[in-house]
From Swiss-Prot:
Residues with site note (Cleavage): 2-3, 6-10
GO BP, sorted A to Z: chemical synaptic transmission; neuropeptide signaling pathway; tachykinin receptor signaling pathway
Record localization: Secreted
Organism encoding this protein: Cavia porcellus (Guinea pig)
Keyword terms, alphabetized: Amidation, Neuropeptide, Neurotransmitter, Secreted
Official protein name in the record: Substance P
Main function: Tachykinins are active peptides which excite neurons, evoke behavioral responses, are potent vasodilators and secretagogues, and contract (directly or indirectly) many smooth muscles.
């Protein structure tokens, strides 16, 4: 599963 930083990067 993606890391928190990667999740925010998609936004």
């Amino acid at each position: 599963r993606p890391k928190p930083q990667q999740f925010f990067g998609l936004m």
